[in-house]
Amino acid sequence: MATSVQTGKAKQLTLLGFFAITASMVMAVYEYPTFATSGFSLVFFLLLGGILWFIPVGLCAAEMATVDGWEEGGVFAWVSNTLGPRWGFAAISFGYLQIAIGFIPMLYFVLGALSYILKWPALNEDPITKTIAALIILWALALTQFGGTKYTARIAKVGFFAGILLPAFILIALAAIYLHSGAPVAIEMDSKTFFPDFSKVGTLVVFVAFILSYMGVEASATHVNEMSNPGRDYPLAMLLLMVAAICLSSVGGLSIAMVIPGNEINLSAGVMQTFTVLMSHVAPEIEWTVRVISALLLLGVLAEIASWIVGPSRGMYVTAQKNLLPAAFAKMNKNGVPVTLVISQLVITSIALIILTNTGGGNNMSFLIALALTVVIYLCAYFMLFIGYIVLVLKHPDLKRTFNIPGGKGVKLVVAIVGLLTSIMAFIVSFLPPDNIQGDSTDMYVELLVVSFLVVLALPFILYAVHDRKSKANTGVTLEPINSQNAPKGHFFLHPRARSPHYIVMNDKKH
């Protein structure tokens, strides 16, 4: 059976050090068009999600991650130790499954960029063409990862700087020039438009996109154990991360919202739409650079998808180690890649992609369903995280931990309940059709989302019920936790949701 090796960690991580290894989560260029559909109220949604959801998740996860004996294993360990192994298995499974669905909006973005580069609209509009192209890209990227992930983090680093950060700053700079020139702005930015129209329930659905942009912070909570002064520095780091996320996402989303009217934004290709308008206004003589920028964005998101393929499966591998999965899922190839877990995840992605793209028309509705489905699946894990934390506070107050949410038991419960209630609210509004989906499409939106969710929801519980956990997988694999001292180069440029929590050690070779 696989074993886990504990490694000592020097308490050397400072406030800025922790911020640096977590900051990659605040850049999500492919979500900017979705943000933009809410106009100036996107700032309100970002503040709401940051204060009522991001901060509670970060604080609760940090306290659980520093409980003696719970330092490794993440949400699986926390939920298993508070609610039981069945729920721990479900929680980590939902993290694994949400990545499978989360690939779909990213692939749609890639196809949107490709359609601009190749001047091939069908690639972004025709469902069959879109499906075939997305499947080819997905499995081609998977093949590059089966050979091992030695260079994955470095590729992700290059992709982050050249394909995410650089285009984002170009977008913001062009938008600033556009605004300064006195060009027409597609939205109003004042105190009235700051708040969404609460009388229109459909306008609230976009909140799920803002929740998604904050998801994954719990994956970095294990590094709290490495901080020299977690009680002081960790809450400040969370505040800095929230401010950075709000500032960058606000400016990025508004750069699109003020150029493209909300009802004309293409969620897959909205960034390229905006670059086209901005460049034609600011520097029409070099409008050809839009295709170059599109190529950078394409490479950035391709690098991101590639880097997300193996990491979550390695995280899920801990359940095979605990005999919660059939022995086949514990199999590794010679390069330390859990191929059965990776292939299973990609099969789920492929099936969902085919269904959503062809029944949803391959347009904004397909994108929105994939986005909402990703969120509701992941929220199921967060329900268990918050409930598990409440159990920890009420039933295990004497367990030693390095970090405590300040303020005592009452404050701890308030933080957890606020996070849980916000999660429930986000979960409910996810199933409401957005305003830009009208007529018969609203029924299709709800039906597709509900059925897809119920199928995915059932998977972990069915597998847990039918699997004989007495069988043992003899893999000869050792798991070595990754920390800030031994992490591979470029590891922290991966989004926290996509990072592998441990090395795979086989035959004395670390993967």
Curated annotation (Swiss-Prot):
Single GO cellular component term: plasma membrane
Parts of the chain on the Periplasmic side: 36-41, 115-127, 179-200, 261-291, 357-366, 434-445
Keywords: Amino-acid transport, Antiport, Cell inner membrane, Cell membrane, Membrane, Transmembrane, Transmembrane helix, Transport, Virulence
Xref: Gene3D superfamilies: Amino acid/polyamine transporter I
Compartments where located: Cell inner membrane
Transmembrane portions of the chain: 15-35, 42-62, 94-114, 128-148, 158-178, 201-221, 240-260, 292-312, 336-356, 367-387, 413-433, 446-466
GO MF assignments: antiporter activity
GO biological process: amino acid transport
A Pfam family it matches: AA_permease_2
Membrane side Cytoplasmic: residue ranges: 1-14, 63-93, 149-157, 222-239, 313-335, 388-412, 467-511
Main location: membrane
Activity regulation (UniProt): Shows pH-dependent activity.
Catalyzed chemical reaction(s): 4-aminobutanoate(in) + L-glutamate(out) = 4-aminobutanoate(out) + L-glutamate(in)
Membrane topology recorded in Swiss-Prot or TrEMBL: Multi-pass membrane protein
Family: Belongs to the amino acid-polyamine-organocation (APC) superfamily. Glutamate:GABA antiporter (GGA) (TC 2.A.3.7) family.
Annotated function: Involved in glutaminase-dependent acid resistance. Exchanges extracellular glutamate (Glu) for intracellular gamma-aminobutyric acid (GABA) under acidic conditions. The ability to survive the extremely acidic conditions of the stomach is essential for successful colonization of the host by commensal and pathogenic bacteria.
Stated name of the protein: Glutamate/gamma-aminobutyrate antiporter
